[in-house]
Swiss-Prot record:
Acts as an anti-CsrA protein, binds CsrA and prevents it from repressing translation of its target genes, one of which is flagellin. Binds to flagellin and participates in the assembly of the flagellum. Keywords: Bacterial flagellum biogenesis, Chaperone, Cytoplasm, Translation regulation. GO terms for cellular component: cytoplasm. This is Flagellar assembly factor FliW. Belongs to the FliW family. It comes from Clostridium botulinum (strain Alaska E43 / Type E3). It is found in: Cytoplasm. One of its GO terms (biological process) is regulation of translation. The keyword Chaperone applies. Gene3D superfamilies: BH3618-like (2.30.290.10). Pfam families: FliW. Disulfide bonds: none annotated.
Amino acid sequence: MIFVSKVHGNIEYEEKDKITFKKGILGFENLKEYALVDLKECEPFKLLQSLEDDEAGLIVVCPFEFFKEYEIKLSDEDTTRLDVKNQSDVVLLTTVTLDSDPKKITTNLKAPIIINISNNLGEQIILDKSDYKIKHLLIEE
């Protein structure tokens, strides 16, 4: 299938790869269906594009690419809501805020996006009891 994004143009995806966020994503609670798109020219970044709004897309990244020590513990409620049967089915991403100065690019370690790739259910969770920041510099000096 092809989705036309105002910002990123034609985005090809398979229906089986559509990710459903039952509660939406913070700031986009009314949008539930997304596609995760590789940005080959900007690896390791990816685009989480809404399939319901051609202007709604988020740049995301696997936080472990930049923060080897980053860790979260999914609650039993999280794993139940996402129907996680196997930890290897969980993909963890964080949203990225871009800046023309690469030293000012930030990522949200406080509210990661969790995707169960076995059933394509996703959810953004908030880590209440952590010292992680909403705007954590991606490249620390």
